[in-house]
Amino acid sequence: MPLRFPIQRDVDYQCVKGSRIWAAGSGKTLEMSSSEVRITTRQHLKRGQKMRLAIDWPAMLDQTCRMKLVISGWIVDSQPGEAAVKIERYEFRTRGAQLAVMAS
């Protein structure tokens, strides 16, 4: 089992089914590992659903440009107020408009 780190950062999330967004919100990361992220949620989310996350990242590109960690994955555990997402794919992006980051 990978090490989990207690990292608290702002996160925007979307639950998607096909091209349809059925839930969206914002919260905080609770802990992160190389394969999973646990976040707070405003609603109870369904286990097994596809999810996209955009996490405000503390490091800056060239000391001047703020970054986001964008993650696609699946909800592997869900409880009222939080969810765990298995990381399927991730990439770092420069911060833009919230919805623009989540759109792709």
Regions from the language model: what does each represent?
Residues 1-104:
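Structured alpha-helical
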